[in-house]
């Protein structure tokens, strides 16, 4: 664990780590905490026991990793640090198996809890929202193409609507990246603009969203907005997935509509995570 998380774990103030401790201690295991250094992760393979990493790849047979599933109190314990390799990513979503009343209740409660008044006035103002992430010129292994190429593909697949890009607040963009955006994309295609409003405003007002694998696409489901994905991720099931079906089909699926947002959010977050707020959380952890 990193320094702050390690201190919280040892003092018992981190709820999920405390719940893990309680669950495994109840089975007779002794729990110890260590820094998340490369040295300690290597040592974990030689210890007589199991290891649980925070977000790092569990590289040996006796290791797992845990990670927040976007929103508290939803967590996952998995055999891979890559979200698109998680069990839920490989599972099949069948909306007919989800209770409609429970799905509506889940959507109503969590929409308000997570986004408050932002979800009160959802419209379609006739534009595509593209929340950029990092490394705009790189085509990484989990991506169908680079983020810059993704924007150009959107220009091709969406010939009419304005396309609003936003920058990730935690990313730093290079001069080459900015030149590509300004000169090769925005100047060449005036429909493509850099947005300056709050991202929740764009979620509430866009027709649909395009991204590599930003969690904004999951958030968009609370606003009942569909997304085109160019990267692999765990919440891909009701999105237009370019990585799997190609750009033309992915955009066609999104524009066709009919996505079961309420059923999906209940299935993805409630039925396929460890919910730290549930009474049976210790058994969920052990399972």
Residue ranges and their predicted role:
Residues 196-241:
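A donor-sugar binding/catalytic signature common to diverse glycosyltransferases
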Residues 1-110:
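Secretory-pathway glycan-assembly enzymes, especially type II membrane glycosyltransferases
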Residues 152-194:
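Catalytic donor nucleotide-activated moiety binding site of glycosyltransferases and closely related
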Residues 47-50, 64, 125, 161, ...:
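Short, well-ordered alpha-helix to beta-strand connector turns
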């Amino acid at each position: 664990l990193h320094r702050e998380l390690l201190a919280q774990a040892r003092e018992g103030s981190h709820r999920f780590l405390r719940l893990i401790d309680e669950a495994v201690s109840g089975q007779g295991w002794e729990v110890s905490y260590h820094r998340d250094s490369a040295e300690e992760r290597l040592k974990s393979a030689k210890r007589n026991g199991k290891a649980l990493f925070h977000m790092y790849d569990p590289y040996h047979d006796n290791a797992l990793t845990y990670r927040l599933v976007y929103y508290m109190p939803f967590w996952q314990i998995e055999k891979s640090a890559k979200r698109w390799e998680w069990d839920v990513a490989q599972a099949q979503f069948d909306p007919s198996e989800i209770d409609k009343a429970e799905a509506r209740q889940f959507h109503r409660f969590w929409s308000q809890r997570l986004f408050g008044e932002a979800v009160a006035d959802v419209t379609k103002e006739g534009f595509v929202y593209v929340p950029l992430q990092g490394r705009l010129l790189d085509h990484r292994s989990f991506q169908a193409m680079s983020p810059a190429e993704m924007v150009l593909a959107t220009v091709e697949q969406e010939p009419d609507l304005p396309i609003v890009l936003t920058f990730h607040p935690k990313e730093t963009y290079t001069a080459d990246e900015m030149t590509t955006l300004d000169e090769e994309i925005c100047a060449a295609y005036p429909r493509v603009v850099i947005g300056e409003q709050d991202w929740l405003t764009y979620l509430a007002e866009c027709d649909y969203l395009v991204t590599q694998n930003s969690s904004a696409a999951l958030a968009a489901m609370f606003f009942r907005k569909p997304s085109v994905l160019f990267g692999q991720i765990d919440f891909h099931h009701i999105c237009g997935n370019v990585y799997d079906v190609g750009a033309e089909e992915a955009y066609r699926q999104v524009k066709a509509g009919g996505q079961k947002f309420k059923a999906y959010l209940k299935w993805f977050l409630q039925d396929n995570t460890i919910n730290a707020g549930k009474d049976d959380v210790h058994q969920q952890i052990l399972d």
